Amino acid sequence: MEKIIELKQNNERIYPLSNSQGVLLSNTSSISLYDSIYSLKGMISLFSSKALGDFVNTTWTQTEDGIQAAGIGEDNYIKLNKDYFCDIKHTRLKLSIGSDNKLIFAFSTKNIGHGVVPSKFYIDMQNKKIGMYKLKNPLGHAEYVLSDVWGESDMPLDFAAGEYIFEIIKSSYKSIIRLTNYLTGKSCELICDDTIWSVGAQNGPLHIYLENGAEMPVIKSLDVFTLNNPDIVFVGDSITEGFCVEDLRYRVGELFRIEHPNHKVMISARGGCTIAAILSRFEDEFNIYKPKKMVVNIGANGGNTKGGFDSLKQKCDDIGCTLYLCYNVCYTSTVEERKHQYVNNMIEEWSILNHIEGARFDIATAANNNPVNDESQLPNEDLFSRNTQPYNLHPNKAGQIEMYKRLPIDLPNMHYLVTV
C-alpha cells in the first residue's frame, strides 16, 4: 500500500511514440503509458461493422464507399447504439475525411454531450487539430461537456483530404485519441492522463456528426475492442467507477490494478447503475470477454433483489466466472431500499445461502468500524466526499483506500489470485 499512497503528481510531458507528433498533457506521467496502452495484447472484438443497418441513423446513407454523412450539425448524427462500461476500450474507425471537415465524436448517455460523465472529441481538418473538450465539474455531478477545449494536438502539415484511421482509447481513467494517415502512416495523438474525469469517462453510446464542412465524410469501418479474458473485473455503480474521488488512481479497482501489474484487471461501472444494469452487461460485454473473477458492489441506487442475485450468479456460472458480492459502504439514505442496513442484510442472507464471499466495505467506512448493520452503524464522515449531496454516499480517496484494505482480509484468495 505504501507504494501507491506515496505516488506523486508532476507536470512532465512525454512523447510515447517516436513516429508521433502528438503531445501528452499529463500530471501523472510516472505511470508508463507505453506499457499500459501501446503494448497491450490479447484484445477481443465487441463490435465490428461497415453497414449502416448496424447503427442508429438520422441522415447518413450507405454508399459503395461506406456510410456517408448527408448534412451538418448534431441533428445529423450516426450512433453506435451499444453502451459499454469496460474501462479498457479501443474504438477504431477507418474514415474518408474532407479537407474542410470538423468531425465530432461524442460518448453520451442522454443528449449529445450530456449524461453520466460524457466525453466529446474532435478532428478539425481545416485547422489541422485533434482535440478534447472539457467536462464540467468532474469532481461533482459531471453531467455535461463544455464548449471549452481541454487540449489539442497539431496534425502534420501534409494532412489533407483522404483516408485516415482514428482511434479513441479508454484505458482506466486515461483518454487517448490518435489520427493516422492511411497512406503515409504519419500520426498525431493527444493523451489526457489527468487523475479526475477532465474530459469525461467515454460513457454512453458513440455519436458521430459533421459540425462543419462541405465535403461529406465517409465511415468505412468501425470496430470496438476490449481486453479478452481478464483475471478480474470490478463491477458496480458510481462508487466503483470512482465518482467524486479526488484521484482516480485510488479507486478500489485501480489500487488492485496497480498492485497486480502482471494481471489483467478491468473496471466495468457506471453511475446510477442497479443490479438490472449489471445483468444487461452480459450480452454486450461479459459473455464476450469472459472475466475469470467478478467483484460486484451494487445497491446504493436501490433495485437489489435476491432474484437478481440468483440471475447474476447463474450468468457468472455460465461463463465460468467466480462471483464475489461485496457489502455496500456505510452511506446515508432516507429511502428504505437504499439504506445500507437493508441492502447489506439482503446481501448477507443471500451470500450465506449461496456460499458467496464479499468484502466488508460497510465495516471499512463505518464510524469506529462498527460491524453491525443496523441504525447504530453510522458512517465515518471523513471517508466520504462533500462534492455532492447526500454527503455520506460517495467514498473519497481515503474511503476507497479503506475499502481496498478489506480485500486481503475478506477475500484473500481473490486478492492474492490463489488457484483453488
Regions found by a protein language model. Give the residues of each.
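Short, solvent-exposed beta-strand-to-loop segments that form ligand-recognition rims
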Residues: 181-203
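Short, low-complexity N-terminal tether/leader segments at secretion or assembly junctions of large
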Residues: 1-39, 214
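Catalytic His-Asp segment of secreted/periplasmic serine-dependent ester chemistry enzymes
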Residues: 332-420
